[in-house]
Amino acid sequence: MKEYQVYLERARSRQQDFLYPLIFREYIYGLAYSHNFNRSIFVENLGYDNKYSLLIVKRLITRMYQQNHLIISANDSNKNPFFGYNKNFYSQIISEGFAIVVEIPLFPELSSSLEEAEIIKSYKNVRSIHSIFPFLEDKFTHLNYVSDIRIPYPIHLEILVQILRYWVKDAPFFHLLRLFLYNFCNWNSFITTKESISTFSKRNPRFFLFLYNFYVCEYESIFLFLRNKSSHLRLKSFSVFFERIFFYAKREHLVEVFAKDFSYPLTFFKDPLIHYVRYQGKCILASKNAPFLMNKWKHYFIHLWQGFFDVWSQPRTININQLSEHSFQLLGYFLNVRLNRSVVRSQMLQNTFLIEIVSKKLDIIVPIMPLIRSLAKAKFCNVLGPPISKPVWADSSDFDIIDRFLRICRNLSHYYNGSSKKKSLYQIKYILRLSCIKTLACKHKSTVRAFLKRSGSEELLEEFFTEEEEILSLIFPRDSSTLHRLNRNRIWYLDILFSNDLVNDE
């Protein structure tokens, strides 16, 4: 139990007790408004055009405490005639202030008291999106079952706020936070719809992103603890693990009770062949064990979300499939394990044997139809795939138009260069190339055929298909067979930290 006590003390040491006074500090809202600060965090700047006033921020907080709905109410208009300010603007400023105040004790890069070595160490945790695929290629060929899990969203956003209670023990801070949410975010309803959560996340991206990531981090901390110390106890006994405050004390008491009252001994087992991967709002659990243990973890997840986080989750949101028979989607790719069968002839003395060898290979395929839907949504083609022009870019110069298309093509090419089959990637590049030609023809008020005759189809946009080969030729010998082999193999770019918007569309 010593390791449990160390884990508990480490968790308690991170609790912060005095965050409320920071809400009334002017520099907090200056940081929220500053373009440079927003650029340093991985959230896009909201682009405020107005100047903020700390006096109005303090007045808003005072009015929330007074509950004067003649001045501020959930149904108020965006422009309050009494004060003459934009309520949405100041609600975003206050929400950014809340996010910054809570981020200060939790993110090392925001604290000036840390040593430089620790700051550098914190940035090493930022890893490429593509770093996960070599791991999957190495591990998934030895596994049998995969569980595709959709992380449920809370029925009420206040559940996300309540999770902070285990780490931040400042009652006035949470009282003010709830007043703000009920006054500005219309949280009076018992159940918050997914559309309302989406609207709130768009208006307050930084604040919502912090709350959601904290929710995911909290459930993963419990899951990883149970993963490292899994028990063979019955499922009904799992409910006592949910209350985090007395988590470890109850676990120790449970072991003592079962050891005294039951004849069979309590044993703990570790499962080294189980792997967990999370991306966006989904996660994947893969294992080599029998389906029984995968179903066990499925029920653990459901009871964890329902019993501890008050989040409704249905069993159909967790699918358990055999890797050799089903494919799953991950970060814009389709992945499945393919069985390669080969026959080897073996001869011993005068006897000849035919031995069948079965090997596994992870196939990583570019999904052509979702990408075409994404291109159609971005107005590069129609829903069936034929390219169309981009009239909104026609006001730019020819160089800017080509550069825009080339950057999109380069990003998609880098992201999908790890695919097993490049045919789908070539189709996407072909659509972008023709869309670029049609956009240029639209700008010059000409047909595509006339424009190609005047400009020369051989030289125009040739870099769309030759850039990758030119880059590889600078690194490797100029041998056609070498370039052909590199073009067929998977190339993972370990400097990709963000996925393209076209990749995120599902």
UniProtKB/Swiss-Prot annotation:
The gene is matK. PANTHER family: MATURASE K (PTHR34811:SF1). Usually encoded in the trnK tRNA gene intron. Probably assists in splicing its own and other chloroplast group II introns. It comes from the Eukaryota. Keywords: Chloroplast, mRNA processing, Plastid, RNA-binding, tRNA processing. Belongs to the intron maturase 2 family. MatK subfamily. It is found in: Plastid, Chloroplast. The keyword Calcium does not apply. GO terms for cellular component: chloroplast. InterPro entries: Domain_X, Maturase_MatK, Maturase_MatK_N. GO terms for biological process: mRNA processing; RNA splicing; tRNA processing. This is Maturase K. Its main location: plastid. Disulfide bonds: none annotated. GO terms for molecular function: RNA binding.
